């Protein structure tokens, strides 16, 4: 049976084994998918042994995405621009193909929600790795991006790098123009620490829709909770993105695209 895994540290909380088992059942694919704890020191060696033993592919989560990128022999364009890899596939010739399905997952979930139309203006909060992983697919979907970060130079560097792919500008988090954004995406890690992004609430109130790339199992993320407190209706966390990026990885490995929307409706958590 073909073997797959998700590598991360920590990894016990991962929903990926459940997600991929549902996809396998849905598409009649015979495969095994497990969670593997990566070692900070020996991750590269662990991964080499994993593939030497016949594994067909794996997902990579924090904190190993950049290291997996370095290990891959070939990369997709979206993986190259992200400079991070969340999906590896072993090719027939033994080489490792690196991909990044985070942005594709985000785009798929925004389409599911009906929040992605051409020529929209999207405000993205944060200019870290999460943002870098989704910029190319958003720009390819003809979105106009405003990138806001506390350190302006970091946002400017990203905007300059991605300018060839579409319309993108950088602003300081404290100087976001007060306008009606079609969509605001929180790509900061503040929710992991139980905090919200410190910014002008008027900007959130004026937005048509708001999306948090983080997700929480039992309760709203801090960002989602804040948006709801402000009376916003079109608010979502990133659980759909998690499931959709897994669907794109599954498609890369197995050649069949599972229906991720059906999984979101199941009481499987």
Curated annotation (Swiss-Prot):
Known catalytic reactions: shikimate + NADP(+) = 3-dehydroshikimate + NADPH + H(+)
Active site: 65 (proton acceptor)
EC number: 1.1.1.25
A Pfam cross-reference name: Shikimate_dh_N
Cellular component terms (Gene Ontology): cytosol
Gene3D superfamilies in alphabetical order: Leucine Dehydrogenase, chain A, domain 1, NAD(P)-binding Rossmann-like Domain
Binding site for shikimate: 14-16, 61, 86, 102, 215
Keyword NADP: yes
Amino acids binding NADP(+): 77, 126-130, 149-154, 213, 238
Top-level taxon: Bacteria
An MF annotation (GO) of this entry: shikimate 3-dehydrogenase (NADP+) activity
InterPro entries xref list: Aminoacid_DH-like_N_sf (IPR046346), NAD(P)-bd_dom_sf (IPR036291), SDH_C (IPR041121), Shikimate_DH (IPR011342), Shikimate_DH-bd_N (IPR013708), Shikimate_DH_fam (IPR022893), Shikm_DH/Glu-tRNA_Rdtase (IPR006151)
Keywords: Amino-acid biosynthesis, Aromatic amino acid biosynthesis, NADP, Oxidoreductase
Pathway(s) this gene product operates in, as recorded in its UniProt entry: Metabolic intermediate biosynthesis; chorismate biosynthesis; chorismate from D-erythrose 4-phosphate and phosphoenolpyruvate: step 4/7
Enzyme class: oxidoreductase
Subunit description: Homodimer.
Function: Involved in the biosynthesis of the chorismate, which leads to the biosynthesis of aromatic amino acids. Catalyzes the reversible NADPH linked reduction of 3-dehydroshikimate (DHSA) to yield shikimate (SA).
PANTHER family: BIFUNCTIONAL 3-DEHYDROQUINATE DEHYDRATASE_SHIKIMATE DEHYDROGENASE, CHLOROPLASTIC (PTHR21089:SF1), SHIKIMATE DEHYDROGENASE (PTHR21089)
Family: Belongs to the shikimate dehydrogenase family.
Name of the protein described by the UniProt record: Shikimate dehydrogenase (NADP(+))
Source species: Pasteurella multocida (strain Pm70)
């Amino acid at each position: 049976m073909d073997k797959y895994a998700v590598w991360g540290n920590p990894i016990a909380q991962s929903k990926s084994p459940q997600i991929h088992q549902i996809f396998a059942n849905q598409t009649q694919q015979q495969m095994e998918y497990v969670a593997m704890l990566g070692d900070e020191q020996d991750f590269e060696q662990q991964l080499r042994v994993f593939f030497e033993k016949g594994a067909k592919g794996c997902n990579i989560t924090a904190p190993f995405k950049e290291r997996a990128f370095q290990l891959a022999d070939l990369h997709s364009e979206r993986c190259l621009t992200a400079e991070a890899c969340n999906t590896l596939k072993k090719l027939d010739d033994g080489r490792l193909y690196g991909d990044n399905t985070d942005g594709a997952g985000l785009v798929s979930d925004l389409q599911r929600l009906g929040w992605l139309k051409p020529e929209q203006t999207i405000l993205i909060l944060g200019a870290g790795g999460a943002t870098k992983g989704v910029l190319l697919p958003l720009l390819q979907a003809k979105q106009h991006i405003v990138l806001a970060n506390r350190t302006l130079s970091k946002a400017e560097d990203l905007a300059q790098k991605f300018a060839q792919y579409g319309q993108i500008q950088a602003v300081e988090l404290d100087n976001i123009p007060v306008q009606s954004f079609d969509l605001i995406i929180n790509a900061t890690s503040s929710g992991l620490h139980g905090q919200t992004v410190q910014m002008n609430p008027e900007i959130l109130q004026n937005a048509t829709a708001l999306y948090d790339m983080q997700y929480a199992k039992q309760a709203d993320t801090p960002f989602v909770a804040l948006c709801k407190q402000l009376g916003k209706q079109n608010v979502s966390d990133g659980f759909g993105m998690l499931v959709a990026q897994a669907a794109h990885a599954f498609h890369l490995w197995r050649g069949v695209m599972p229906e991720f929307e059906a999984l979101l409706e199941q009481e499987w958590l």
